[in-house]
A protein has these predicted regions:
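Post-Walker A helix-loop "phosphate-sensing" segment adjacent to the P-loop in P-loop NTPases
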Residues: 35-47
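A short catalytic or substrate-binding loop motif that flags glycine-/basic-rich loops and adjacent residues
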Residues: 9, 70-73, 84
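Short, hydrophobic/aromatic-enriched beta-strand segments in well-ordered soluble domains
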Residues: 31, 79-81
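Residue-level detector of short, conserved catalytic/binding motifs and their immediate flanks
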Residues: 13-15, 77, 90
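Short, hydrophobic/aromatic-rich segments at coil-to-beta transitions
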Residues: 71-79, 100
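Electropositive, glycine-dotted interaction segments
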Residues: 83-203
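Pre-Walker A-like glycine/lysine-rich segment at the N-terminus of P-loop NTPase domains
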Residues: 1-34
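AAA+/P-loop NTPase substrate/partner-engagement loops
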Residues: 49-70
Length: 203
């Protein structure tokens, strides 16, 4: 089914990644898993999730170690996603599990004006006009994403939307032998019965 995103372009709900062995397909999935788990895990640990969450395997943020220069440089993530009529841009830079820089922006789908939600550079955090309130704490653990910190401690619509999007992501990489041994079952009792019945029919 096509996802209709008027006035912006329509989207297909599925994407396929092709490439030769050693071409980076698994690395791309691991990078996405790393980013998602980095954001979601602190929220999950504090029991502040807003959706039913399937806990993803934690992937550590490890730089490319076969190059003297890159082994000491931060790993950078840049992700665009759409939810609730907005397109979000999330940037995260990490080194040795510490946040070097982080930013979250959004704009209406089809719109031109981008609004900064927050910008973080080291210990300096600048809040956008939509959340620039004196009551919001800017003193955060260097190992915690500020997006996660805001999601845990405050009720901010833009942060809630971003949080729900990250929590809804499910990544399964069957290049991981542990993942091949796991089966994901729905909480819906009817679907669960149908699935188990189908497995029994196959012997």
């Amino acid at each position: 089914n096509i996802i209709y995103c008027k006035p912006a372009s329509n989207l297909l709900p599925v994407a396929a990644i092709y490439g030769p062995n050693g071409g980076g397909k698994t690395n791309m999935l691991q990078a996405l898993t790393c980013l998602i788990s980095t954001v979601v895990k602190p929220i999950y640990d504090m029991e502040k999730t807003r959706t039913k969450l399937i806990v993803q395997q934690k992937v550590s943020c490890t730089p490319f170690l076969f190059d003297e220069k890159t082994s000491s440089e931060p790993t950078e993530f840049l992700l665009y996603f759409r939810t609730n009529g907005y397109e979000y841009r999330y940037y995260l830079s990490m080194l040795h599990d510490e946040i070097i820089a982080e930013a979250l922006d959004r704009k209406k789908i089809g719109g031109k004006r981008t609004a900064r939600i927050f910008d973080r550079e080291g210990k300096v955090i600048i809040l956008g006009s939509s959340i620039n309130k004196a009551s919001i704490n800017r003193d955060v653990n260097p190992k915690m994403p500020y997006l996660s910190f805001l999601a845990i401690n405050y009720d901010i619509p833009a942060i809630n939307d971003a949080q729900k999007w990250f929590e809804s992501c499910i990544i399964r990489s069957y290049a991981n032998p542990e993942a091949e041994l796991q089966i994901m079952l729905s909480d819906n009792k009817t679907i669960r019965r149908q699935f188990i019945s189908a497995l029994n029919d196959m012997g």
